[in-house]
Amino acid sequence: GMASKAGTIAGKIAKTAIKLAL
């Protein structure tokens, strides 16, 4: 549902942020 979608989006943003930080 909405919760899992939000979690997936948050995960993608986190991965992108980590890549940019490196």
From Swiss-Prot:
It is found in: Secreted. Keywords: Amidation, Antibiotic, Antimicrobial, Fungicide, Secreted. The keyword Nucleotide-binding does not apply. Expressed by the skin glands. The keyword Secreted applies. GO terms for cellular component: extracellular region. Its main location: secreted. The modification Leucine amide is found at L22. One of its GO terms (biological process) is defense response to bacterium. Has antibacterial and antifungal activity. Belongs to the gastrin/cholecystokinin family. Magainin subfamily. This is Peptide PGLa-B1. It comes from Xenopus borealis (Kenyan clawed frog).
